[in-house]
């Protein structure tokens, strides 16, 4: 094979579709816009949810609920994720972040009881579920609310 014989892989380079270049091109005359109407004109920009002047669905339905601006969002960690640490390790949010188990701390870390804990650990977090608390203490570990 020589350099002048190189060809791109089949289907890797798509030919640009040139519209309005004669009827035999398949996209002449109306250029793929159909017949007359708002969407056939230039400069058309219908916003999402526009229903042609009919009251849109989001306005027909009633408002419901609210967003609590004081709500706290905790980063969730399950027990089986803590098995990566050695026995006797003190697990804090900083240690969890360094280990790549959590990305951001948000309002703190909450430990949940999903999975099985196999190590004896000292876990420091903002909140614990009852099942997580029981599992950690059952393995001889301890918890501390920070």
From Swiss-Prot:
SUPFAM superfamilies: Ribosomal proteins L15p and L18e. The keyword NAD does not apply. One of its GO terms (molecular function) is rRNA binding. Residues 1-57 are annotated as: Disordered. InterPro entries: Ribosomal_uL15, Ribosomal_uL15/eL18, Ribosomal_uL15/eL18_sf, Ribosomal_uL15_bac-type, Ribosomal_uL15_CS. Residues 23-35 have a biased composition (Gly residues). Residues 1-13 have a biased composition (Basic and acidic residues). Gene3D superfamilies: 3.100.10.10. One of its GO terms (biological process) is translation. One of its GO terms (cellular component) is cytosolic large ribosomal subunit. Keywords: Ribonucleoprotein, Ribosomal protein, RNA-binding, rRNA-binding. It comes from the Bacteria. The keyword S-adenosyl-L-methionine does not apply. Coiled coil: none annotated. Binds to the 23S rRNA. Part of the 50S ribosomal subunit. Belongs to the universal ribosomal protein uL15 family. PANTHER family: 50S RIBOSOMAL PROTEIN L15, LARGE RIBOSOMAL SUBUNIT PROTEIN UL15M. This is Large ribosomal subunit protein uL15. It comes from Streptococcus thermophilus (strain ATCC BAA-491 / LMD-9). The lineage of its organism: Bacteria, Bacillati, Bacillota, Bacilli, Lactobacillales.
